Swiss-Prot record:
Positions occupied by motif Microbody targeting signal: 232-234
Keywords: Hydrolase, Magnesium, Manganese, Membrane, Metal-binding, Peroxisome, Transmembrane, Transmembrane helix
Name under which the protein is recorded: Peroxisomal coenzyme A diphosphatase ndx-8
Listed GO CC annotations: intracellular organelle; peroxisomal membrane; peroxisome
Record field: transmembrane: 170-190
Role according to the record: Coenzyme A diphosphatase which mediates the cleavage of CoA into 3',5'-ADP and 4'-phosphopantetheine.
Noted pH dependence of activity: Optimum pH is 9.5.
C-alpha cells in the first residue's frame, strides 16, 4: 500500500491534479474515471471501454468508464465517475483503486461537459461488464497516444481539431477521449507528442517556446472546457 500511495503522489504532481472536483455547470455534466495501471513494466496503461452497439448514442465508440450526472450524485462529479465505473465495469473505489484527483473539465462537441477523475489501480480487479452499456474493455499503454504512427486529425466546423488513433492492436480511439489520453500521456511520460496538439499549439510552438509538460497540459486545460465558437482555432 505504501508503494501505491508513493506512486500516486508522483502521478498527482505530474498531472497537476486538483483535490477538489470540478463543479457542475448546471447543464449537461458527465463524470469519467481515468483508471491507470502501473504494472512495473515501465508502460503505464489506461483503461478504455468500447460502448455497447445496442446504445442509441455513440454505439461502438471508445470511451472511459463514466456517464451523465444523476440527482443521487449531489452535484459531485467525482461521485458520478465512481458510481458509473462501478456500474459499467465493476471496479470499486475502496478495493480496486485509489483516487488521485481531478483534471479540469473537457467539453465534448455537443455541449456535454466531461469531468475526469484520475485513479491508480491498487490490484488487478475482477471486471464485471454491464452488457447493455459496455461491449469490451482494454488496457492500452499511454505512450501510444504520443506517437504519430497511427495518428491523424480532422476539423469540425473548420476550427476544432479532432485527434484520431487507428491502432492495429487496439480499437480506434478519437475525439475528446483521445485528447484526454494525450494530455495524461504528456504529463505522466514527460514527452511531447509527435504531432500538432491544437490549432494554436503546434510542434513548432512547443519546441520553439521550450514548453515543458506541465506548461503544455495547462495550455490544453485553458481551452478544453470552452464552448464551441468557431472564432479561434483550438
Amino acid at each position: 500500500m505504501k508503494c501505491v500511495v508513493s506512486r500516486a503522489d508522483d502521478l498527482k504532481r505530474m498531472l497537476d491534479l486538483s483535490d477538489v472536483p470540478t463543479k457542475s455547470q448546471g447543464e449537461q455534466d458527465a463524470g469519467v474515471l481515468i483508471l491507470l495501471h502501473d504494472d512495473g513494466s515501465e508502460k503505464l496503461k489506461v483503461l478504455l471501454c468500447v460502448r455497447s452497439r445496442q446504445l442509441r448514442r455513440h454505439p461502438g465508440e471508445v470511451c472511459f468508464p463514466g456517464g451523465m450526472m444523476d440527482d443521487e450524485d449531489g452535484q459531485n462529479v467525482r461521485r458520478t465517475a465512481i458510481r458509473e465505473a462501478y456500474e459499467e465495469v465493476g471496479v470499486n473505489e475502496n478495493d480496486d483503486y485509489l483516487v488521485l484527483g481531478n483534471l479540469p473539465a473537457f467539453r465534448a462537441r455537443f455541449g456535454v461537459l466531461i469531468h475526469p477523475t484520475v485513479a491508480l489501480l491498487r490490484r488487478p480487479p475482477t471486471f464485471v461488464l454491464s452488457i447493455g452499456e459496455v461491449e469490451s474493455i482494454f488496457w492500452i499503454p499511454l505512450s501510444q497516444f504520443l506517437e504519430d504512427t497511427h495518428h491523424s486529425t480532422f476539423l469540425i466546423d473548420e476550427f476544432y481539431m479532432v485527434h484520431v488513433f487507428q491502432f492495429d492492436e487496439y480499437p480506434t480511439t478519437y475525439g475528446v477521449t483521445a485528447l484526454m489520453c494525450i494530455v495524461v500521456a504528456i504529463g505522466l511520460l514527460g514527452k511531447l507528442p509527435n504531432f500538432n496538439l491544437m490549432g494554436n499549439l503546434t510542434i513548432s510552438d512547443m519546441l520553439d517556446k521550450h514548453l515543458d509538460s506541465i506548461e503544455i497540459i495547462r495550455h490544453v486545460y485553458e481551452f478544453a472546457s470552452r464552448k464551441f465558437e468557431p472564432k479561434s482555432k483550438i
